[in-house]
Design a protein with these regions (language model features):
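Short hydrophobic alpha-helices and adjacent helix-cap/hinge residues
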Residues: 1-254
Length: 254
């Protein structure tokens, strides 16, 4: 059984834990030890192993700093979800270790769309950049779910400071940049592990949890132009320039 994302790995994985069914997870932001799926990252111990999405937050902020040298501080902006919370904690830990190129200021984690908008606008006047994480579990004042692209459209139309993100999907949405924690790479590695289990009869309990290599540095040309950021002298550090913004209805949707 292959399980993608924290919710599936936690809730379904734990139902299969200790059975004869091999389980491979991927796209897990939280530490796998937290969910009780593995006893050790190097030697999981039972029938579950997989791919840990450890993130390239520092690399994303490094790229932002190189594109916007005057940036000194940033805030985190995210919905309050099972997926977002581990990302927030990882960035907080990096900030406490003082290994980030920008100083972490405020942390905005909410599922209220009005609260999200108000705090984002207020905070954008006090910091130089945002780190935008997942924003797909917000609700309006009436309790109705607000689509991620609707949130993204509001953000791109109202926030005038640069942002980093952690996955390519957000750059294709319209956010400025990422050092991509590639979902494709995670899925590929997960299927490699599953193949070893099925064809080579490798014991998942002896297969170390893996973290895939960083994906490409992506920058959104449209957002850069909107913010007045020139990419002309920075192309050597960019792997891929994106010229679409799904949240604004520009280009193909992903």
């Amino acid at each position: 059984v292959l399980l993608g994302d924290d919710n599936a790995a936690n809730y379904i994985g734990n139902q299969l834990l200790g059975t004869s069914v091999p389980v491979v997870f991927w796209g897990v932001n939280g530490l796998p030890l937290k969910y009780g799926l593995v006893e050790d990252l190097d030697r999981p111990g039972r029938n579950v192993t997989g791919v840990w999405q450890s993130g390239y937050y520092r690399e994303s902020l490094d790229l932002l700093k190189r594109l916007v040298p005057k940036a000194r501080s940033f805030a985190i902006l995210a919905c309050d979800s099972e997926t977002s919370r581990p990302n927030v904690k990882m960035i907080e830990q990096l900030a406490k270790r003082d290994v980030l190129p920008l100083k972490l200021g405020e942390i905005i984690v909410t599922n209220g769309f009005e609260d999200f908008k108000r705090r984002a606008l207020e905070t954008s006047r006090r910091v130089d950049a945002f780190f935008v994480l997942n924003h797909d579990t917000l609700r309006d004042a009436g309790g109705r779910h607000v689509e991620m692209l609707t949130v993204g459209r509001w953000y791109l139309q109202n926030i005038r400071i640069p942002e980093a993100s952690h996955e390519d999907q957000f750059v294709y949405e319209g956010m400025l940049l990422t050092a991509n924690d590639s979902g494709y790479n995670q899925g590929y590695v997960a299927f490699e592990m599953a193949q070893l289990i099925l064809e080579k009869r490798v014991n998942p309990g002896r297969m170390a949890v893996r973290t895939p290599d960083r994906g490409p540095y992506l920058v959104n040309r449209l957002r850069a132009e909107q913010l007045g950021i020139s990419l002309a002298e920075s192309m050597f550090m960019i792997d891929e320039v994106v010229s679409e913004a799904a949240a604004l209805g520009i280009g193909r949707n992903r």
